[in-house]
């Protein structure tokens, strides 16, 4: 049995301490929707808090080699169901006909460069002044993502190789994911390490409950979380 007052107090404490360390990674410039996502120019910088970022898979057109951002062609090809048009050569394609674009990234935990399926940020949902907004990632968002990608994790995170099996072979084959930490973007992995570190400071039986609560959101932070407009 958990003392509810203790839980409430220390859960908020973990969040507060964690946000002091990682809060900046989820900040984004507020955009004026009336100007089609252009950044609001003001003497006072307006920043919102990111709720989530939508990442899109990238495919290669087998005819012309153009990189195709899947969510963008889905929007422009709504009447074609599972088919879409290459913006460069105009060929009508299906997802299964295209190879995934790949990229090489340095994996800090593996201490080596690894090949993974390329994904790019296409939408940011954020809160500003009590309201939710959506925008395309701007130059500052991209710069911040790249900055975090080059940073070292401040604390340890679980390092677990995926076991062989039907469900684990799917992400291994489609996205090159072979380890648990590869399910997360560097930004989310950074935050996970901070929160786990703050949870580890509690040497009490209640720590298990706090940790369990945090772990319930890990699936939603992963690359396999589906975006439903």
Regions found by a protein language model. Name each.
Residues 1-229:
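Nucleic-acid modification enzymes, centered on SAM-dependent nucleic-acid methyltransferases
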């Amino acid at each position: 049995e958990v003392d509810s007052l203790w839980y409430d107090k220390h859960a908020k404490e973990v969040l507060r301490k964690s946000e002091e360390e990682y809060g900046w990674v989820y900040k984004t410039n507020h955009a004026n929707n009336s100007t089609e996502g252009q950044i609001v120019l003001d003497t006072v910088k307006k920043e919102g808090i990111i709720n989530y970022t939508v990442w899109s898979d990238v495919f290669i057109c087998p005819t012309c080699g153009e990189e195709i951002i899947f969510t963008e062609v889905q929007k422009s090809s709504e009447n074609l169901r599972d088919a879409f048009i290459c913006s460069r050569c105009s060929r009508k394609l299906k997802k299964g006909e295209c190879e995934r674009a790949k990229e090489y990234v340095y994996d800090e935990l593996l201490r080596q460069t690894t090949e993974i399926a390329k994904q790019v940020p296409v939408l940011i949902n954020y809160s500003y002044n009590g309201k939710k907004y959506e925008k395309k990632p701007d130059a500052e968002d991209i710069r911040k993502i790249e900055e975090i990608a080059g940073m070292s994790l401040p604390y340890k995170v679980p390092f677990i190789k995926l076991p062989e099996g039907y469900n684990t072979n799917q992400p291994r084959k489609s996205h090159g994911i072979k380890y648990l930490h590869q399910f997360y973007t560097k930004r989310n992995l950074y935050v996970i390490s901070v929160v786990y570190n703050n949870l580890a400071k509690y040497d009490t039986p209640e720590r298990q409950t706090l940790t369990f609560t945090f772990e319930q959101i890990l699936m939603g932070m992963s690359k396999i979380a589906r975006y439903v407009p």
